[in-house]
Amino acid sequence: IKYCGTGGVFSKGTRVGAQQYTPEEVAAIVDESHMHGRKVAVHAHGANGIKVALKAGVDTIEHASLIDQEGLELAQKNGAFLSMDIYNTEYTQSEGPKRGELEEFLRKDREVAQLQRDNFKKAVQMGIKLTMGTDTGVHPHKDAPKQLAYMVQYGMTPMQAIQAATKVGAEALGIEQTAGQVAPGYSADIVAVTRNPLDDIHSLDNIAFVMK
């Protein structure tokens, strides 16, 4: 179950990070979802909306651009996952005008991009669970590997970035017993690249072969 806990970059007329639900409303969303065996994801840029979600027991935070130190510590304590799509601003700023995106959206993206990256680096240093996100609908899936290079640039090792896109992603979705690893009994699409991604993470931008 996903809900929009704060204003967004591509939300017309909203302030990025403005809290949109009361703590009581968020608690009801999380409690009902968990009671039915569903995980809860929240679209949240702003620090207050993030902390309300984490205190209610949300499972994953999407974006987490303006998360503060208290929010980082809550995520660490709760074992929550952060999905911080730190490549997206390059795509938004280069392709947004061609797609007719509003200047409001482009401006808001510029305002939060570096803050999100700085907070991603802090999260890496704290050992918080980070998974790769694509921001579906904003960023094309074919460019998803570009996120990995930025994750390395902002503090991860290449192996940590690859695991964020595979093993940790499966854990975030609750399917870690059947996916996320190349192991007996697991489902996986296996890719081949021309160079070792542990030496050059950009090699994952050019997939030579996919074995389903």
Question: Model regions: which residues?
Answer:
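Catalytic metal-binding/acid-base residues of hydrolase active sites
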Residues: 45, 87, 137
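Histidine/acidic residue-rich metal-binding segments in metalloenzymes
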Residues: 1-5, 9-82, 98, 110-130, ...
